[in-house]
Amino acid sequence: MTIIRKSHPLSKIVNHAFIDLPTPPNISGWWNFGSLLGMCLVLQIFTGLFLAMHYTSDTLTAFSSVTHICRDVNHGWLIRYMHANGASLFFICLYIHIGRGIYYGSYLYKETWNIGILLLFLTMATAFVGYVLPXGXMSFWGATVITNLLSAIPYIGQDLVEWIWGGFSVDKATLTRFFAFHFILPFIIAALATVHLLFLHETGSNNPLGIPSDXAKIPFHPYYTTKDFLGALIXIMFFMTLVLYFPXXLGDPDNYTPANPLNTPPHIKPEWYFLFAYAILRSIPNKLGGVVALILSILVLALLPYIHTSNQRSMMFRPISQFLFWTLVSDLLLLTWIGGQPVEPPFIIIGQTASXMYFTIILIXMXLAGLIXNKXLKW
């Protein structure tokens, strides 16, 4: 068996990626989220495939087809809620995965990090077009508002919006093309995730100490396969509790009414995992400025390898940077809360302050903290 595992062209790839892969001996539970993201992607592709068998992407029947899935299809309600809440699980794992990358300095693997940012953009795009598909009230207005942001692009903006809509508003053409995008994007994500892994295995994994671990590596199997399996088991337990007991807790009640172009919901807001970016978008009183800030809120991650000033890779032994990191986490939670609130005082000023803090901490404060740490340690 060992001979085939190491010699057969196909099993050799799997062997080098998941079995005989040399892994640092001290990576903690924060390193479990990569495999959990893989699990989420597989879950979403399979539940999505079964939903697509019964869904119709027509404005007249989209909402009814989702209702039909929940009422008439065997276990349709379960598949639908697993898919809807699976997106939330995906983003929870994604944000923790990125946070771990920032905390332990994993962004210094530039290729892996940049492909990760591309994966984040693609996942956000997939989640957005997917949210439009049930053609509920919040789906319709969310699609209208977010696609309309493109009209802020000078000169070609309005034409671009109408080109994406396939008409003069969100209609049948929009729904059909969004369904097509929603179906194809996860497979592109899966392909990119493989490339992400390929680049990671070129350098090997980072570890909590942020120091080379070449001297003490251990095989991935059985140590980390077991650990990943335990992580998956815990995540599935929490996930199924959410799906079976509180399936509609993370959704928007407005989405249980069919889309109506004549009736606007009181507060148009996206799903919870986009609220921080939505708050940054709304905190700038200019349309184009808001769109630029929205894109920069994610793109700023690409600058991290270039503004890393510390002589230590990880934040494990850098208390000032740790304080800033957790301040950033609190700031993002604050932005998430603000994104779900109406645009009125005092929320406007809180949102603007939190947005400014977000960029200040990442671009200025973290770079300065690294320099201070170097100075204090006389490095």
Curated annotation (Swiss-Prot):
Transmembrane regions listed in the UniProt entry: 33-53, 77-98, 113-133, 178-198, 226-246, 288-308, 320-340, 347-367
Single Gene Ontology BP annotation: mitochondrial electron transport, ubiquinol to cytochrome c
Family matches, as SUPFAM superfamilies: a domain/subunit of cytochrome bc1 complex (Ubiquinol-cytochrome c reductase), Transmembrane di-heme cytochromes
Residues binding heme b b562, per UniProt: 83, 182
GO molecular function per UniProt: metal ion binding; ubiquinol-cytochrome-c reductase activity
Protein keywords: Electron transport, Heme, Iron, Membrane, Metal-binding, Mitochondrion, Mitochondrion inner membrane, Respiratory chain, Transmembrane, Transmembrane helix, Transport, Ubiquinone
Entry-linked InterPro entries: Cyt_b/b6_C, Cyt_b/b6_C_sf, Cyt_b/b6_N, Cytb/b6-like_sf, Cytochrome_b, Cytochrome_b_C_euk/bac, Cytochrome_b_N_euk/bac, Di-haem_cyt_TM
Subunit details: The cytochrome bc1 complex contains 11 subunits: 3 respiratory subunits (MT-CYB, CYC1 and UQCRFS1), 2 core proteins (UQCRC1 and UQCRC2) and 6 low-molecular weight proteins (UQCRH/QCR6, UQCRB/QCR7, UQCRQ/QCR8, UQCR10/QCR9, UQCR11/QCR10 and a cleavage product of UQCRFS1). This cytochrome bc1 complex then forms a dimer.
Reported function: Component of the ubiquinol-cytochrome c reductase complex (complex III or cytochrome b-c1 complex) that is part of the mitochondrial respiratory chain. The b-c1 complex mediates electron transfer from ubiquinol to cytochrome c. Contributes to the generation of a proton gradient across the mitochondrial membrane that is then used for ATP synthesis.
Protein name: Cytochrome b
